[in-house]
Amino acid sequence: MVSVTRTVFGELPSGGGAVEKFQLRSDQLNVDIISWGCTITALQVKDRQGKASDVVLGFAELEGYLQKQPYFGAVVGRVANRIAKGRFTVDGKEYHLPINREPNSLHGGFRGFDKVLWTPQVLSNGVQFSRVSPDGEEGYPGELKVWVTYTLDGGELVVNYRAQASQTTPVNLTNHSYFNLAGQGSPDIYDHEVTIAADAYLPVDETLIPTGVIAPVEGTAFDLRKPVELGKHLQSYHIHGFDHNFCLKESKEKKFCARVHHAASGRILEVYTTQPGVQFYTGNFLDGTLKGKSGEVYPKHSGFCLETQNWPDAVNQPQFPPILLRPGEEYNHTTWFKFSVA
């Protein structure tokens, strides 16, 4: 059984409207999602002793989400991840996007899908959010109708993304939740054991744009096909963290993507997706300056993201999976976050 409760989370400044919170509850999970950016603000999971902790980074009040912050829990779009120099060409026409992360465009621009109010509809086992992104929003061509649906099934949170375009446009939607399976506010994720089912990854340049090479993980720090303890792994390869796309099998079917196990609590997160990639990000840009829930600060490496996605800069790299959505087609992808204990 899933229950859905609807309350007001806060009011946007200058009469911008009410932001609502939807609490989805099952016997195993409690998930809070707000209509601002379709943002997951809390996710309570039990450990092996039956004690629940909130395992996502974020804020207790709306004000936290309205300040400059690193996309905690939000849906990002129209195109998640980076587009090189904020430029791309569709049908012979060049489009220029705002450069919001020098020298590139990141996560849809200055006012991406994470910074808008969505229209909610309560379902029996979840909530669906919708919006229309107007033609030219943040420089993108065509009007885009978008639906993001969160449903709960026992220990599994399912996120479905659908979109329809009036004109050919790139589309790439993901959720940017930061997880810490020890509980948000724990200082780091070094004791998390990570597995990612990818035989290849995308090397990047100094601005985090893929070089175009699809590199085998074999014999590199990116070989996460067998479980590695994150802290020891980063140390042994002398790397400062991950912020890379891992290449999954390019089928539209549901496939296993990643597994993260926190031995001390027993919590396990498994991710399945229909997407061709996942950005594994270890919170390298977190710096402890933001005050989160219950006054916690979030230093570097205090959370990780598994952003299921198309590959970064795919609109400029024809050898990457296709990212263009044409009129009459439907963008439709699903990601499953499955929680359990061992």
From Swiss-Prot:
Residues forming the catalytic site: 176, 307
Gene3D superfamilies given in the database record: 2.70.98.10
Pathway(s) served: Carbohydrate metabolism; hexose metabolism; Carbohydrate metabolism; galactose metabolism
Biological processes, Gene Ontology terms: carbohydrate metabolic process; galactose catabolic process via UDP-galactose, Leloir pathway; galactose metabolic process; glucose metabolic process
Listed PROSITE patterns: ALDOSE_1_EPIMERASE
GO cellular component terms, A-Z: cytoplasm
Catalytic activity: alpha-D-galactose = beta-D-galactose; alpha-D-glucose = beta-D-glucose
Sites bearing Phosphoserine, chain numbering: 14, 124
Subcellular location: Cytoplasm
Residues of the signal peptide: none
Chain sites annotated for binding beta-D-galactose: 81-82, 107, 176-178, 243, 279, 307
Function as written in the Swiss-Prot or TrEMBL entry: Mutarotase that catalyzes the interconversion of beta-D-galactose and alpha-D-galactose during galactose metabolism. Beta-D-galactose is metabolized in the liver into glucose 1-phosphate, the primary metabolic fuel, by the action of four enzymes that constitute the Leloir pathway: GALM, GALK1 (galactokinase), GALT (galactose-1-phosphate uridylyltransferase) and GALE (UDP-galactose-4'-epimerase). Involved in the maintenance of the equilibrium between the beta- and alpha-anomers of galactose, therefore ensuring a sufficient supply of the alpha-anomer for GALK1.
Quaternary structure note: Monomer.
Similarity section: Belongs to the aldose epimerase family.
PANTHER family: ALDOSE-1-EPIMERASE, GALACTOSE MUTAROTASE
Name of the protein this chain belongs to: Galactose mutarotase
Lineage: Eukaryota, Metazoa, Chordata, Craniata, Vertebrata
